């Protein structure tokens, strides 16, 4: 499991990149995210979660029910037909998400663009 957290001073958004290996302990990931995620800021949590986006677990419960984020990816992102690359954003975030399929990967790439910059 890996997490990269990026916040830029004086800009009200936080980008968190996640790689969750297969079978990772979601409770540990939730504990790490609880420490990282800020309040009163636009949040984007995205990455390779290695479970189908429709699966319910401690991580999806925390991001959707507790942090009130919405999952934007609703198409298969892996060659096996599952949606394992997710993008959770704050409800107030006005973003556009598109996919692209690099030839060198078994995952689709996600391109996240702000429709309206929050600063």
Regions found by a protein language model. Give the residues of each.
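A shared catalytic/ligand-binding motif for oxyanion handling
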Residues: 1-119
């Amino acid at each position: 499991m890996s997490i990269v957290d990026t916040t830029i001073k004086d800009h009200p958004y936080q980008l968190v990149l996640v790689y969750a290996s297969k079978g990772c302990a979601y409770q540990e990931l939730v504990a790490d995210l609880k420490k990282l995620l800020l309040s009163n800021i636009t949040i984007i949590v995205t990455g390779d979660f290695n479970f189908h986006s429709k699966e319910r677990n401690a991580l999806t419960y925390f991001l959707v029910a507790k942090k009130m984020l919405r999952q934007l990816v609703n198409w298969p992102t892996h060659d096996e037909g599952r949606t394992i690359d997710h993008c959770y954003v704050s409800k107030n975030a006005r973003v556009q998400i598109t996919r692209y399929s690099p030839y060198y990967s078994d995952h689709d790439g996600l391109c996240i663009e702000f429709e309206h910059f929050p600063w």
